[in-house]
């Protein structure tokens, strides 16, 4: 259990700190403040609250990375590389769901609030829309996506090393 918590903390806090730093550097260096991809005429809530969206992805990554490194700690060679790539791709898809819900919550804060049963339908719509479009918005977020993919790969590889290390008493 301690090892699982250690890996989750390492992946979650490490990825959030590094992804936030990468965002901060890119946002301040010539990208006109546009680090993330967006649809034409899309409300830019991810520009108003970037660290919330980064946190959603990072802690989804921490959960999937911890699960993957814990279940198959001794995967090696090309299988490990493929497995790490799979964890990162799955993270994008899985994080798109809560990311869509968060976008819908920010939409409600902007004045588009619904009541009663429609509230839950709107959140479900946000989850479905996030799953449909989140991966594409991630692809449009170049070079942020590439830098974070490389960092995520290295962090996950280290998570595998932590998971495969002999237990200390």
Task: Describe the predicted segments one by one.
Residues 1-169:
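Juxtamembrane/disordered regions of integral membrane proteins
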């Amino acid at each position: 259990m301690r090892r699982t918590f250690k890996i989750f903390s390492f992946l979650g806090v490490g990825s959030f700190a590094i992804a936030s730093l990468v965002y901060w550097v890119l946002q301040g260096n010539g990208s006109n403040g546009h680090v993330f991809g967006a649809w034409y005429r899309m409300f830019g809530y991810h520009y108003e609250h970037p660290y919330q969206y980064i946190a959603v992805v990072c802690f989804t990554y921490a959960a999937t990375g911890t699960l993957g490194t814990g279940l198959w700690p001794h995967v090696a060679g090309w299988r490990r590389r493929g497995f790490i790539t799979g964890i990162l791709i799955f993270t994008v898809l899985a994080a798109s769901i809560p990311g869509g819900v968060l976008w819908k919550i920010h939409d409600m804060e902007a004045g588009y609030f619904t009541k009663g049963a429609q509230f839950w339908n709107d959140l479900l719509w946000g989850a479905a829309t996030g799953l449909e479009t989140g991966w594409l918005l991630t692809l449009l977020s170049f070079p942020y996506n590439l830098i974070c993919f490389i960092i995520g790969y290295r962090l996950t590889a280290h998570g595998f090393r932590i998971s495969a290390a002999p237990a200390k008493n």
